[in-house]
A protein has these predicted regions:
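Hydrophobic beta-strand core positions in alpha/beta domains
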Residues: 38, 117-118
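Phosphate-binding/catalytic loops
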Residues: 3-16, 115, 121-188
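Conserved active-site segments centered on acidic
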Residues: 2-112, 182-188
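Helix N-cap/beta->alpha junction signal
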Residues: 47, 120-121
Length: 188
């Protein structure tokens, strides 16, 4: 597991500054929509699954014109990769297609998104260190805080857990995403 280093933080901040200087970001075409970013370590298991589940809920409720989601990882080593094959298979079995390409959290994600959802305590701490302002740090929440059917304080990384780990994570994310969606809709 990669810990954030000062060089990693500086790299992310520098990319943010370069982005602001370019002034042409429109990746998601999401002006005037509520924007949610799901974050895990590598953006190949938990966060793309959360994004897929959340987007499914948004579509079921015909709210695509009001709410959008994306996902990213603290670690950039998987950038450009598809979600883990085991997660894609487990998600597809439940009706969720995961077509996301992994990417690393970018400095400009903080002002761009309304809510940034961390999968575990380390992701949360890393995001808090990356947040460029106190205002941006208030957007960071733990996914586990939206769980109502499960008594667990974080979403575990299923990477080394076997097939039952992927199933557990999907159970947790379905619970959390459903409640997250409901809490967002109340604010719109």
């Amino acid at each position: 597991m990669q810990r954030l280093t000062q060089n990693t933080i500086e790299d992310i901040v520098n990319r943010s500054v370069n982005y602001k200087n370019m002034n042409n970001h429109n990746d998601l075409n999401i002006n005037n929509k509520y924007k949610v970013l799901f974050v895990c370590l590598g953006n190949i298991c938990r966060s793309p699954a959360a994004q897929g589940i959340f987007e499914h809920i948004v579509r079921e409720n015909a709210m695509q014109d009001r709410i959008v989601a994306d996902s990213a990882g603290i670690y950039g080593g998987h950038s450009g990769s598809h979600p883990d094959r085991r997660m894609r298979t487990a998600a597809l079995y439940r009706g969720y297609g995961l077509s996301h390409s992994a990417r690393q959290v970018r400095g400009y994600d903080f002002p761009e998104f309304d809510l940034i959802v961390a999968m575990d305590d380390q992701n949360y701490e890393d995001l808090m260190h990356l947040a460029p302002s106190v205002e941006d740090s208030h957007k960071i929440v733990r996914m586990a805080s939206y769980l109502t059917e499960h008594k667990i304080s974080y979403i575990p990384d299923p990477y080394y857990m076997g097939s039952e780990g992927f199933s557990l994570v999907l159970d947790l994310l379905e619970d959390g995403c459903r409640n997250l969606y409901e809490s967002i809709v109340k604010t719109l």
